[in-house]
Structure formats: C-alpha cells, structure tokens
UniProtKB/Swiss-Prot annotation:
This is Thymidylate kinase. The lineage of its organism: Bacteria, Pseudomonadati, Pseudomonadota, Betaproteobacteria, Burkholderiales. Phosphorylation of dTMP to form dTDP in both de novo and salvage pathways of dTTP synthesis. It is an enzyme of class 2 (transferase). Belongs to the thymidylate kinase family.
Length: 204
C-alpha cells in the first residue's frame, strides 16, 4: 500500500493554483485514496481566525511572519500530522514555501529568521510534492482584477510580486526533488494532463 503523502500547491496570487487543487484531489480519490484538503493560513479554527487578521490587518513584517508560523504550528498539530498518521493524503493550498516567498521575497524579511522558525515549527515535516504554478506578473494581475475584492497581499505592487515569484523559483531550484513547476499560462486541459502524469508517479 502506498504511504500517505503531503502535497502542497504554491504560486503567486493569480497563478491559478486553486483551480487545479480540486482536480488533483479528485484524481487521488478516484484511486481510492482518502484525501484531506486544507489551506494556509487556516485549516483550524485558530488558523482561520489568524487568516482573517493576516489578510486584512496591517502589521510589522516580523509580526506577520510569526503569526503565519503560529497558524502553521496549530495546523500541523491539529490537522496535517493526524491525517497523515491515519493514512490520509493531505493537500494544502500553500505551506512554508509561501512564507519564504511572500514574507522573505516580497517583504524582504531575513531568510535566516524564517529558516529558524521553520526548523522550530516543523523540523521533520516537509511536503512530498510541491506543485508551483508559475505565471508572468501581468497575467496574474489580470486574473486577479477580473475575479474578486482583493486582500492586502493581492493589492501589493508589481515589484512585490516580482520578488515573491523570484523567491518561489529560488526555492524550487533549492529543493528540486520535491518541486514541480507548472507553466500556468497553458490551457487548463494541458495543465491537467501534466498533473495527471505527476500524480501517477506519486500514487501508482
């Protein structure tokens, strides 16, 4: 029997990752896997309360990072680790790579500080697979403008998203064993075929 896996979806706002999350969850369920779908910040009652604060309240950049990791610690303890222990597959819309990208890249917070928090909060847990949906900034912005009211991160300027995207790509280069980069400008059907192949290799 295939060991339960932890899969994360990453990308700048407007990259389209959330569109494909349910597709991957359905693929796994079709192969008789129990699947837990969650998100960050969020996933628990405390995490969802912190999400509202993080997405809408102004704060010091270090406060923002600390709250992200506080929500993550609760998420791991209350949802992710218990699910994996049960043998359930976990799919999370964002995880620690997002904090490195947004707070480290976009906000320019010292990467070493984030690494210390990462080692404290989850020294042994890393995703088995990280799907990074990559897209040019102008495409991402057009998608955001066409969808909904924007939160404080989505309202950031182009240089913030350029730095965030660059940090995502740096993380992918640093951890190539778990990252798969998806060109999110492709047709949905093309992306889903790629996802089907990737998941087939992970969940035979």
């Amino acid at each position: 029997m295939t060991k339960a896996k932890f899969i994360t979806f990453e990308g700048i706002d407007g990259a389209g990752k959330s569109t494909h999350l349910s597709f991957v969850a359905d693929l796994l369920r079709a192969s008789k896997k129990n699947v837990v779908v969650t998100r960050e910040p969020g996933g628990t009652s405390l995490g969802e309360a912190l999400r509202t604060i993080l997405l809408h309240e102004k704060m010091h950049l270090e406060t923002e990072a600390l709250l992200m990791f506080a929500a993550r610690r609760e998420h791991i303890a209350q949802l992710i680790e218990p699910a994996l222990a049960r043998g359930d597959w976990v799919i999370s819309d964002r995880f620690t790579d997002a904090t490195f990208a947004y707070q480290g890249g976009g906000r320019k917070l010292d990467r070493q500080k984030l690494s210390v928090l990462e080692q404290w909060v989850h020294p042994h847990l890393q995703p088995d697979l990280t799907l990074l949906f990559d897209v040019p900034l102008d495409v991402a912005r057009a998608r955001l403008d066409a969808t909904r009211t924007l939160d404080k991160f989505e309202q950031e300027q182009a240089d913030f998203f350029a730095a965030t995207r660059a940090e995502y790509l740096r993380r992918a280069a640093e951890f190539p064993q778990r990252f798969r980069i998806i060109d999110s400008t492709q047709a949905i059907a093309t992306i889903q075929e790629q996802l089907r192949d990737i998941i087939a290799g992970l969940a035979p």
